[in-house]
């Protein structure tokens, strides 16, 4: 069994709790999880809200990989529509280099309108941006090169430096709850990430459908 800890960085319901204290407490929990033999530390990406405020989970995991050297670190997830795919690939490559191959790279497309509005990105573009950026990033992490010629990202072929040092086989994840996202994750060959926000009796058929699609595509 693989056991991880999801880091949210939330202060919702904590009256007058400083943001710095929230972060200090989460880092303490991360250390406890690492020392207790957990397999992976995971972090969401959210912005501007008490519900969760960790705007750069790759940056966070680079720090945690240094202070917790015996546990994997994962992103659940980097919200691709909010980022340039080239920068995501570069930053992930740096984290994986410094952590000696301990990154589990997870991607998502986001869902909070408040966040999309702040980044001046239409929610109508989330599926297109994700489906375009995700394979570009995966290809860059696997081969060291990125290029793209889609409607959102015109990227001339360029080499990623530092070059990826470790195989990302089996270390790519995608958050998927909707039917479209489950299909997208399967096409990418990514591990399927699903949050426990409803009874597992409702989730189990979706998970099994994702497995069937993965077998179909691969």
Predicted regions and their residues:
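Flexible loop/turn segments at secondary-structure boundaries
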Residues: 12-13, 50, 82-83, 181-182, ...
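Hydrophobic faces of well-ordered beta-strands that scaffold small-molecule active sites
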Residues: 3-7, 41-43, 73-76, 103-107, ...
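Alpha-helix N-cap and loop-to-helix initiation/capping positions
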Residues: 17-25, 52-56, 83, 87, ...
């Amino acid at each position: 069994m693989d056991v991880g800890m999801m880091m949210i960085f939330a202060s919702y319901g904590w009256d007058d709790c400083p943001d710095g204290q929230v972060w200090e407490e989460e880092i303490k929990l991360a250390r406890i999880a690492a020392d207790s033999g957990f397999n992976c530390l995971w972090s969401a990406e959210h912005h501007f809200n008490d519900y969760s405020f960790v705007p750069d989970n790759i940056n966070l995991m680079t720090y945690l990989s240094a202070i917790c050297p015996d546990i994997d670190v994962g992103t659940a997830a980097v919200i691709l529509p909010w980022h340039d795919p080239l920068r995501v690939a570069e930053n992930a490559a740096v984290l994986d280099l410094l952590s000696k191959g301990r990154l589990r790279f997870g991607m998502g497309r986001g869902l909070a309108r408040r966040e999309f509005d702040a980044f001046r990105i239409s929610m109508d573009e989330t599926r297109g941006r994700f489906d375009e950026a995700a394979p570009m990033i995966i290809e860059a992490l696997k081969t060291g090169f990125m290029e793209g010629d889609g409607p959102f990202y015109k990227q001339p072929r360029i080499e990623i430096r530092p070059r990826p040092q470790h195989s990302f086989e089996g270390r790519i994840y995608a958050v998927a709850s909707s039917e479209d996202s489950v299909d997208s994750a399967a096409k990418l060959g990514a591990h399927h990430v699903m949050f426990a926000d409803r009874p597992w009796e409702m989730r189990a058929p979706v998970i099994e459908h994702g497995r069937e699609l993965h077998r179909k595509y691969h």
